[in-house]
Amino acid sequence: MLYNLRQELLAGIRAATSDAGYDYEVDQSAIELEDITDEEKGEFSSPISFSIAAAAGAPPVDVAAAIADAHRSNGLPAEVEAVTVEGGHINYHADTTDLADATLSTILRDGSEYGTRTDADPDTILADVSSPNIAKPLHVGHLRNTILSDAVMNILEARGHDVTRDNHLGDWGVQFGNLMHEYTEFGDEATLEDDAIEHLLDLYQQFEQRDSMLADLEDDETVTDQFADAVTEERDYHADSGKEWFTRLEQGDEDATALWERFRTVSIDRFKQTYDDLDVAFDVWNGESFYAQEGWNDVIIEKAIENDVAMRGEGESVYIPVYPDDYENVGDPQAADVDASLDRARQMREANDDLEDADFDPFYIVKSDGSTLYGTRDLATIEYRIEEYDADQSVYVVANEQNQYFQQLFVAARKMGYNDIKLKHIDYGLISLPEGSMSTRKGQIITAREVLDRAQDRAEEIIAEKGRIDDAEAQSVATKIALATIKYEMVAAKRERDTTFDIDESVALEGDTGPYVQYAATRGYSILDGADAAPEIDDLDPSVFNDTDVELLFELARYPLVLERCEERYDAAPLAHYLLQLAHVFNSFYHKNAVLDAENARTERLLLTKATTQIFDNGLGLLGIDVLEEM
């Protein structure tokens, strides 16, 4: 109800601003939702007068009064009983009776659809989600990506968009040539059969550690020239062999392809076990290899050269120049403005012998040895999504370490002529456990499986301490509590910031945790189970509400606005924070109020409780968290 009311107020204040004589473009920020406990401000307020006052040459309070008068004259929405001006703010006060009738009837009528939206012309969104590298285990960082992206895509679908989740596997590149070299030189068939991912990870780390050690020796001024030459020869042998294996793979060599396919298959099998435990699924698994093997990479290279947006560099390399002034608003198809001409780049190349001295960044699509890069494959992905899906948006849930890369990718895409698609990098900060941060290359991986198992163990301990659940159900309940813990923490933390995830603190029924929200929902079900029969909305009498009842009602009415904010920000954190706040308000509601034993408001409070449990169901469901009817 508040969502629809805000839209009405927005339209009304646009008209009132014009009628009051002010030439000002009113946007969504003109109407703000306020704290229900602040009676002076009302449910909605507008600070628009402060933006208009300077140009109008009038005090904000006078501007606000003029707009408020015009809005009254034009007619206020039926749900608004008064409009006031306080300190330059225009405040709209909702009628509690109308708010209660509209909100509770809508929630109970719409059920699981409350807060969703049907769009007659939805955006087709293709999303890179999870996207692990094969031949390595999923680690705690993949948990954040997988859980965050699942929640965001759930919300975008709930808001009416057509979303395709693409687990864009990292399954192509010279690193897999290195791995094939290492396996053929040092791998063990029996060990691969016993624990494929662990063995492949060991080999990957062995290659990296040896290369790093040899590089250090090359730079060591204390060694003899003869020894340094031997070190260089040894290092080149392994590196060249890895490059050769990848070249063979790109050329479709039978042995290289068979070995790569084996690595890929065992990796996906292991990934699926964890995804099943997380209750997360994907629509497609178009890894980087898809675009190489299906010829999409070739399309990109040919198109870039034919359209004269790419330059040839050293050896066989090809790159698209990215100028400093290309970046602004590059993800927005309406606002992006890039220079696709090569004239500036050619002039810079003529003036500078060294490419690094030129005032542009080369976005490589072919390396000097003729092989492709992930930039090639990412451009191929955009081409494919436009051609095969007619995509309106291509979004990427990837850690913020890659912010600069994605800006360059988007510039390159615009220069390639992909001008009608929205390009969005949904970045997030790194996550660590108190023991320290993870690093694949240093061999300090904290696997997703370890995190899941530790959360499960802690949840089982809590259940045993409480002693409320039958042994037959304890493990299942513990699993849902463990998942609630992990999923809530992964989405509630400020998305762009690095965060530390303390499992022992987070697996708790108190505090700002997923299980705390779960427990509030369970309490709601317990109250409803104690009622003789479900109340009917026709019996609602909002006049019996006290302040605590109204505060809960207001929280329920906010839910669609929260989903709108999540959609605008491509972020599930506002929903996680809202559900926590709803849990706090609901806990206050049933502690301060009698519900089942209420003398005058039993029906009304049962309706509030029923609506609250529905929103817990809906909101937690979007986060991928199960509601428990018993904890």
From Swiss-Prot:
Tell me which GO cellular component terms the UniProt record holds: cytoplasm
**Known catalytic reactions:** tRNA(Arg) + L-arginine + ATP = L-arginyl-tRNA(Arg) + AMP + diphosphate
Annotated S-S bridges: none
Motif 'HIGH' region per record, residues: 132-142
What is the protein named? Arginine--tRNA ligase
Q: Which UniProt keywords apply?
A: Aminoacyl-tRNA synthetase, ATP-binding, Cytoplasm, Ligase, Nucleotide-binding, Plasmid, Protein biosynthesis
Q: Which gene encodes it?
A: argS
- An example molecular function term from Gene Ontology annotations: arginine-tRNA ligase activity
> Has UniProt tagged this entry with the keyword Ligase?
yes
Where does the UniProt entry say this protein principally localizes?
cytoplasm
**Would I find Ribosomal protein among this entry's keywords?**
no
Q: Which InterPro entries match?
A: aa-tRNA-synth_I_CS, Arg-tRNA-ligase, Arg-tRNA-synth_N, Arg-tRNA-synth_N_sf, ArgRS_core, DALR_anticod-bd, Rossmann-like_a/b/a_fold, tRNAsynth_Ia_anticodon-bd
Q: Which Gene3D superfamilies match?
A: Arginyl tRNA synthetase N-terminal domain, HUPs, Isoleucyl-tRNA Synthetase, Domain 1
Question: Which protein family is named in the record?
Answer: Belongs to the class-I aminoacyl-tRNA synthetase family.
Give one GO biological process term. arginyl-tRNA aminoacylation
Assigned EC number = 6.1.1.19
Pfam families membership: Arg_tRNA_synt_N, DALR_1, tRNA-synt_1d
Q: Entry's SUPFAM superfamilies?
A: Anticodon-binding domain of a subclass of class I aminoacyl-tRNA synthetases (SSF47323), Arginyl-tRNA synthetase (ArgRS), N-terminal 'additional' domain (SSF55190), Nucleotidylyl transferase (SSF52374)
Location(s) in or outside the cell? Cytoplasm
